[in-house]
Amino acid sequence: MEARQPNATGSARRPMATPSELHPDLAELAFLLGDWSGTGEGLWPPGETFDYAEEVTFEYVGDPFVLYSERSWSLDDGSPIHFENGFQRPAGPGVVELVLAHPIGITEVAVGTVRDGVIELSSTAVSLTPTASPVTALRRRIEGRGDELSFELHMAMEGVELRWHVGSKLTRA
């Protein structure tokens, strides 16, 4: 058994698969694979802005889905801001599903499109624990161009309509 290498978040993972080893259903998501890092900015209601650093890993694990892990922290003081883990799954040509768990007490299921290195997803379900942040909807856009990846997240909460929440620019490690 081969030794696993740590990824950007410190967990051990298999060496990156080559395009010929990928499950054929993942061809449209292959641009995501790898470890990414960079910075972003965000906006919390009622208008407080913040800057953050972010590390993201998209990993092929042998089945027709991509394992996803994200973590971010404040550029001001290094304190953790957010984590999320889950999977991206192809659901047919040009269609992708996202299943995520967030430590703020929510799970997210989203469906969307993938085309020419752009993924657009909208939540179809957001489930909350009794003490969760009152998130009601999420919309994501991920765009990959070579070794650059950009993220945008729009979020709605109880009493707050869907609006831009965070955006980041990442480079492949």
Go through each PLM region and give its residues.
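N-terminal amphipathic/basic-hydrophobic helices that include classical n-h-c signal peptides
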Residues: 1-15
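Hydrophobic small-molecule pocket/channel-lining residues, especially in calycin-type beta-barrels
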Residues: 13-173
